[in-house]
Design a protein with these regions (language model features):
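C-terminal functional module detector
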Residues: 1-10, 17-169
Length: 169
C-alpha cells in the first residue's frame, strides 16, 4: 500500500520547506528518497555509479550523482557532459537535457532554477527527452534541478547541478 499523503502525514507541502530553504542557503546535496518503515516500492534512492561495488556506489554518492523517485522511474539529467550533482563553470547559457522513462505518462516536467519554476513541459508520454536552454542566464552561480510528475501521481526529482556562468559582456 501507498504511504500517507503529505497532507495526512505532515500537514501538506510547504513551498519554502526544508530542501528549498537549504538550497537557497547554499547547501549542496543530492536528492534521494526512502521510507522510514518496512514498506517497499514506494520510494527509491537511485545512484548513477561506474560499477556495482560498494566503492563505486559511495564514490557516486559523494559526487551527488543520485536522484529520488516514488516509483521505478529512470531519470538522466545533464548539461553538456555534466550530470546531476556536478558543479562547473561555463561561458555559455546552460542547455539541459532530461531523459525520463516512467511507469505512466508524465503530466508535467518542471525545470527549477534557484527555487523558481522556470520551464514546464507537458509530454504526456511515459518516455520522453526534453531540452531547455536558460534564456535568462546571468553571470554568477545558480542551481538547477528537474521534477517530474506522472499522471498517476508518482514523482521523480533529479538532483541539482550548480553552474557558474561567466558570460561575455
Amino acid at each position: 500500500p501507498r504511504a500517507p499523503t503529505a497532507e495526512d502525514a505532515i500537514g501538506g507541502w510547504r513551498p519554502k520547506g526544508f530542501v528549498n530553504l537549504a538550497l537557497l542557503k547554499g547547501y549542496k546535496f543530492s536528492f534521494e528518497s526512502s521510507s522510514d518503515h518496512g514498506s517497499t516500492h514506494i520510494s527509491y534512492a537511485l545512484v548513477y555509479a561506474e560499477g556495482n561495488t560498494r566503492e563505486a556506489i559511495v564514490a557516486a554518492m559523494k559526487k551527488r550523482h543520485t536522484y529520488a523517485a516514488t516509483d521505478n522511474i529512470i531519470a538522466d539529467f545533464r548539461c553538456g557532459e555534466h550530470m546531476m550533482g556536478d558543479e562547473f563553470t561555463t561561458a555559455e547559457a546552460p542547455k539541459f537535457r532530461i531523459h525520463l522513462e516512467g511507469t505512466a505518462p508524465f503530466a508535467k516536467v518542471v525545470f527549477v532554477k534557484d527555487d523558481l519554476e522556470v520551464f514546464t513541459a507537458t509530454p504526456d508520454k511515459a518516455q520522453c527527452d526534453i531540452t531547455w536552454k536558460d534564456p535568462d542566464a546571468k553571470n554568477g552561480t545558480s542551481y538547477y534541478y528537474v521534477r517530474g510528475e506522472q499522471k498517476n501521481g508518482e514523482l521523480v526529482w533529479a538532483s541539482p547541478m550548480w553552474i557558474t556562468c561567466t558570460l561575455a559582456k
